[in-house]
Amino acid sequence: MGDLLDWIISFLFLATLIIIVIYQLTCLADLEFDRINPYDVSSRINRMVLPEFGLQGLLCLYYILTGHWFMAVLSLPHLFYNIRLYMKREHLADVTELYNTNKWEQKKRVYKIGHIALSIFITTYWLIHSALGDI
C-alpha cells in the first residue's frame, strides 16, 4: 500500500509540473500570434519558473527518499538543466528579447513536456502495477 501511495504522490507532482510547463508554452504561443504583449507574457512566465524549478527539485528529492532510484536518475537531467539555467541567470524571460527568443523558448518547453510525459508514462505503469499487486 505504501508503494501505491508513493506513485500517486509522484503522479500528482508530475501532473502539476506538466500543467505549469503547458501554461508557459501557451503564453509563448499567444505572444507568437500577437494575442498578448511581451510584458504580460514575461511576467506570467517568470511567475511560474521558480515554482516549476522547486517542484522538479522536490520531485527528485522525493524519488530519492522513497527509494525509486530509476526515476530519480531519470529526473536528474531535467533538474540539472534547471539548476544550470538558474546559475547562469537564464531562467527568466526577458521582455526585450522575447520576440527574438520565442521559438527557442517554445522548443525548450516542448522538450520539457516530452521529458515529463515520459516520466508520467513510467509512473502510470508503476502505479497500475502497484495497484494490481495490492489486490
Curated annotation (Swiss-Prot):
Xref: Pfam families? Cornichon
Cellular compartment(s)? Membrane
Give GO terms for biological process. vesicle-mediated transport
In the record, what lineage is assigned to the organism producing the protein? Eukaryota, Viridiplantae, Streptophyta, Embryophyta, Tracheophyta
Topology in the lipid bilayer: Multi-pass membrane protein
Q: Which positions, given as ranges, span the membrane? A: 8-28, 57-77, 113-133
State the UniProt keywords alphabetically: Membrane, Transmembrane, Transmembrane helix
Q: Which organism is it from?
A: Arabidopsis thaliana
Protein family:
Belongs to the cornichon family.
Name the UniProt record assigns to this protein: Protein cornichon homolog 5
Superkingdom: Eukaryota
